[in-house]
Amino acid sequence: MAAHCQVTGAGPGFGHSISHSHRRTKRRFDPNIQKKTYWVPSLRRNVTLTLSAKGIKTIDVRGIDAVVADLIAKGVKL
C-alpha cells in the first residue's frame, strides 16, 4: 500500500534510529495510513480512500462531500 494520504498528502519522513551508544542508522517514519470507505451522497456511491489519521479527522470536520469535491478538482481518481 502506498504510504501517502489522499487528503493531506502526508507521506513518509526520513531520519535516523539512534542506539544507546548513539550510532545512527537510516530509517523511515511512515504515517498512520488507513483504508477507509465512505458513502458519498453527491456521487451516490461508496468511495474508498487511503487516509492518514489526520485526514480522517479532516473529513469528520469538513464533511465527505466537501473533501471529495476538492479531490475531484485536483484530478484524483476515486
From Swiss-Prot:
Protein known as: Large ribosomal subunit protein bL28
Membership in a protein family: Belongs to the bacterial ribosomal protein bL28 family.
Taxonomic lineage of the native organism: Bacteria, Bacillati, Actinomycetota, Actinomycetes, Micrococcales
Encoding gene per record: rpmB
Any one GO molecular-function label of the UniProt entry: structural constituent of ribosome
Positions of region (Disordered): 1-30
Keywords assigned: Ribonucleoprotein, Ribosomal protein
Keyword presence, Lipid metabolism: no
Gene Ontology CC: ribonucleoprotein complex; ribosome
